[in-house]
Amino acid sequence: MNLLEDTLKSCPIVKRGEYNYFIHPITDGVPLMNSQLLREVATKIIKISDMDIDKIVTAEAMGIPIATTISLYTDIPYVIMRKRKYLLEGEIPVHQETGYSKGELYLNGVNKGDKVLIVDDVISTGGTMVAIIKALEKAGAHIKDIVCVIERGNGKEEVKEKTGYDVKTLVKIDVVNGKVVIL
């Protein structure tokens, strides 16, 4: 059984302007986050990732439940790149631009030489991932692996082109005729 694919195929689509947004528990936290789905996603990420790491890194907000679940399974701590400053010593700000927003992300709690796994809910334009990578490089961290649950658009290619890193994903989708299609 593949709960991730099953729930994607049946998730609602909302049109905003010319863009079709899929509304799914992994990417939006609504309509309902199923614990079985979260466990499935976390175990699949663990299986395909280099887990010789010191920390799991994600961006707020929807990467948080994924990173938390992986942390609970592995006893590896996680760090959240936040959208607001905390003004802690060593805080690293980085500019983020996606297809629908821009702003700053702030990294705390990652040290030079830390081996990290980056996880996130979705990659579409690659803007968030490029920002995370830049902040981690500035911190002197060693990025061991990058995994996003859902791939939509050309974000993987953008990340590879701009940073040299490959991004693994669990499922690639598109929205066609008002429905999610697994590619």
Curated annotation (Swiss-Prot):
GO terms for molecular function: guanine phosphoribosyltransferase activity; hypoxanthine phosphoribosyltransferase activity. Keywords: Cytoplasm, Glycosyltransferase, Purine salvage, Transferase. The keyword RNA-binding does not apply. Its main location: cytoplasm. It catalyses: IMP + diphosphate = hypoxanthine + 5-phospho-alpha-D-ribose 1-diphosphate; GMP + diphosphate = guanine + 5-phospho-alpha-D-ribose 1-diphosphate. It holds the Pfam family Pribosyltran. Pathway: Purine metabolism; IMP biosynthesis via salvage pathway; IMP from hypoxanthine: step 1/1. GO terms for cellular component: cytoplasm. InterPro entries: HGPRTase-like, PRibTrfase_dom, PRTase-like, Pur/Pyrimidine_PRTase. It is found in: Cytoplasm. One of its GO terms (biological process) is IMP salvage. Coiled coil: none annotated. Its EC number is 2.4.2.8. It comes from the Archaea. Homodimer. Catalyzes a salvage reaction resulting in the formation of IMP that is energically less costly than de novo synthesis. Belongs to the purine/pyrimidine phosphoribosyltransferase family. Archaeal HPRT subfamily. This is Hypoxanthine/guanine phosphoribosyltransferase. It comes from Methanothermococcus okinawensis (strain DSM 14208 / JCM 11175 / IH1). The gene is hpt.
